[in-house]
Amino acid sequence: MTMKKSIIAFPRIGSNRELKFALEKYFRKEITEEELQTVAKEIRLENWKSQKEAGIDSPISNDFSFYDQTLDLSIALGAIPGSYKNLELSELDTLFALARGFQDEQNDVKARPMKKWFNTNYHYLVPEINKDTIIKANFSKLLNEYKEAKSAGFETRPTIIGPYTFLVLADYKSGATKDTVLSDVIVAFQTLLKELNQLGVEWLQIEEPALVLDQTEEEKKLFVSIYEELLKSKNNLNILLQTYFGDVRDSYKEIIKLDFDGIGLDFIEGRDSLALIQKYGFPKKKILFAGLVNGKNIWRNNYQKTLELLTALDEVADIVINTSCSLQHVPVTIKNETKLSKEILKHFSFATEKLNEIDEISDIYFNKNTSFLKKNVELFENERVRENSKLKQKLDKLTEKDFTRQPSLVERRASQSQSLNLPVLPTTTIGSFPQTAEVRKVRLQNKRGELRQADYDTFLEEKIKECLKLQEDIGLDVLVHGEFERNDMVEYFGEKLEGYVFTQKAWVQSYGTRCVKPPIVWTDVTRPEAMTVRWSAYAQSQTSKPVKGMLTGPVTILNWSFPREDISLKASTLQLALAVQEEVLDLEKAGIKIIQIDEAALREKLPLRKSDWYKEYLDWAIPAFRLVHSKVKPETQIHTHMCYSEFEDIIPSIDAMDADVISFEASRSELSIIDALKAHHFKTLVGPGVYDIHSPRIPSVKEIQNQLEKILDKLPIEQVWVNPDCGLKTRGNAETIPSLRHLVEATRVLRKEKVVYDK
């Protein structure tokens, strides 16, 4: 089959989040596994239909997952830690135990660690390799989904994460190394190739995004050794090596020498992809799958620029128009958006629309059909938005002084200690409290205009009072108002700022059942009025304990939005920083003594290659955070929070944010960050999360006590705060309340053991 139009993968949540809702019903035991599988099958069928109808030559199979594709591969290879095997659950329930943890009368196992998938807001479950790991091939999921598509009339290209990326991302325990399982992993993949040959499959797509990371010589040799051996088994099967999220500069010369039939390169984030081809050439007998349509943003493709790039690739004999990465990072379709005007929607392209863009670009380039080009050129010729001149003047006037808080961290600490009068090991939460069906219902009624604002405000006041009373009863030291007025930590602020537009159903998977609806930065961003002061001030008026003001930081707001492409990320972030700074100062004026500015997504846009970290990102992202709090009083304590990323290698930059307290996700990662904090002589006070809120299991007092003891073995008690690892919005009260009681009880035990007076 001749291919000209391709994608890497398609969203798997369903156009109306059908998978999320089915999974949640399954977890609540409201539907059977068979009913869950039926929903999954319907989503897959709809996805294949959409691709085929848009002219995609080879729709993708095995891009579906009930939770995470990396976890699927771990299971396919048999890389399942013994504690999960011993549960003796079904294969599907074992998968969910790995992802969510499992707790019953006889068993109690934690969920596997999650990490951000390269530089995205998607999270993967980290594979574990230990001395007891026995790799054994079981690719029934991939094979069954291929056969399912075939029986429905679709000849698909199965996709799978490759052995190199699997080995690079895995966590090695009890003395195990890559070499421990290398030969067995290769044999397992050889088994897969044999089975695909027997089925008559034409193409297999092997995803190796780890090739865009900095590679050591040892890693380069590992990659080559894997594929020199594996490709001997391909027989009649065509193998596509698919890369994304950057370029493969370290191993391009080796890649083009290997016996791949197709090579997928990213020309959106792959800064050097074109230069590599121009310098080293591209083999005439191989097909280039050119990632020209952005799989991570929602703006229309500029066909003229894409055609210029294709022209520069003229020497390549065989080209397929492809996405730059999986489309799972964008919403499914704009067809669900009925409230945005056509004038706005015409600038957007979600996953389904990107299929059409690929079809049109292909028609223009291969068939010289210029009708689509003319319309696209007109779209980009017209000015979309105008610059805010007042905002530009403010930004132009910024000096180094605006990015520096005085006095120093150590001097401020004394003022804050006196002002707040907190015990050693202060206890708090990260911000949000469980949002019940009632809260979501009332908030939606208000949004639709079905509830008077005064009645809604009264409802929120009651919920805040309940939340404060609960926290006081539990014994927490620093309280939060619960964030019941907020649907999402980014969308809420976007709605209060000028410059954003919002969708109804543009959902994107973050992990498992967790979906987010990123707002879209449409134009220059400003703050017309206070956003959070009303509720923070009310909460503080109801208690004598300090209540944290809760904000999302500028870097995270941008990283969890769909950013503009007509100005730089730095420019957008500084606009947001000025807006958040205004809010911080208003909270301080309202008597809020502790203000938390979450930067949960700080790591997300960090370039994947270390040589680009500072110039391309940290040199402006860290100052943007400092700009937000540079003008507050010494006695105002600034907190920030970060979650589910690897921070160990940027600890000095995090310290340079100059916050007074930083809380980290640490429970799933087994407190690995503590060693890095100690090694770098981290000065900021820290709250490493002592239990995992993304799992429904309830930690015991002893478990939290053990976590705290591990922390205090490495950090001085005066430096430590005690908190969960993230906000509690997605949990239920049934788990949250006992977990927090256990947290406070464990803290009090430690205070007594350390002979510290508990206030």
From Swiss-Prot:
UniProt-listed Enzyme Commission number(s): 2.1.1.14
Origin superkingdom: Bacteria
Residues that, per the record, bind 5-methyltetrahydropteroyltri-L-glutamate: R17, E18, L19, K20, K116, R514, C515, W560, E604
Cofactors, names only: Zn(2+)
Cofactor binding notes: Binds 1 zinc ion per subunit.
Entry annotation: catalytic residues: H694
GO-annotated molecular function: 5-methyltetrahydropteroyltriglutamate-homocysteine S-methyltransferase activity; zinc ion binding
CDD domains: CIMS_C_terminal_like (cd03311), CIMS_N_terminal_like (cd03312)
UniProt-annotated binding residues for L-methionine: I430, G431, S432, E483, D598
The protein's enzyme class: transferase
Reaction catalysed by this enzyme: 5-methyltetrahydropteroyltri-L-glutamate + L-homocysteine = tetrahydropteroyltri-L-glutamate + L-methionine
One GO BP: methionine biosynthetic process
Disulfide bonds: none
Pfam families, A to Z: Meth_synt_1, Meth_synt_2
Pathway field: Amino-acid biosynthesis; L-methionine biosynthesis via de novo pathway; L-methionine from L-homocysteine (MetE route): step 1/1
Family named by the database record: Belongs to the vitamin-B12 independent methionine synthase family.
Role this protein plays: Catalyzes the transfer of a methyl group from 5-methyltetrahydrofolate to homocysteine resulting in methionine formation.
Name of the protein: 5-methyltetrahydropteroyltriglutamate--homocysteine methyltransferase
Native source species: Lactococcus lactis subsp. lactis (strain IL1403)
Lineage: Bacteria, Bacillati, Bacillota, Bacilli, Lactobacillales
